[in-house]
């Protein structure tokens, strides 16, 4: 008798997920999933709820309808942070600390990826030589790169990336795609919102298109 194949559950799954603000629908209901090694590119016009969706998944907003599962198990709002690393529009950095101090501080709060160190993460994102530079002295693009270094150090298997290509030049855009691809090869997954022309999807990418609520 041939034993049935046991497939792993999705790293993230959402069922009947919807969000409203002031009784006005923002998105949903949505059903989608993301497997390990896969990216989901979330597209839609301004106002379609892309940022709101990622903030709901990250637990930054309370959702009144639907279910979110991690590895096949229901995940409450407060339990999802260790599984997810969120990169939003604001870098969330300490302006009066150096780049290296920021990374050490954040690693102390959230841990870090095995075999990765803050100094090497700065080199990966093109900030070698800026270890002692204060964040408030950095350009917008350099701050984005520092936020990407923090993302790279995160041990979380699921990345939630809200417009990660913003404030980056072509080299920076290539860097983001390389990082996402490496994360997927390591068994991670990513949700990426974008409407940019340079958002070349990494391997194993599916699309989720949000429509502006009528």
Curated annotation (Swiss-Prot):
A GO CC term assigned to this protein in UniProt: plasma membrane
Q: Where is the ABC transporter domain?
A: 12-214
**Among the record's GO biological process terms, what is one?**
cytochrome complex assembly
- Catalytic activity from the UniProt record: heme b(in) + ATP + H2O = heme b(out) + ADP + phosphate + H(+)
Compartment list: Cell inner membrane
Which SMART domains did the record assign? Answer: AAA
State the membrane topology. Answer: Peripheral membrane protein
User: Which family does the entry's similarity section mention?
Assistant: Belongs to the ABC transporter superfamily. CcmA exporter (TC 3.A.1.107) family.
Query: How is this protein named in the record?
Result: Cytochrome c biogenesis ATP-binding export protein CcmA
Give the originating organism: Xanthomonas axonopodis pv. citri (strain 306)
- State the gene name recorded for this protein: ccmA
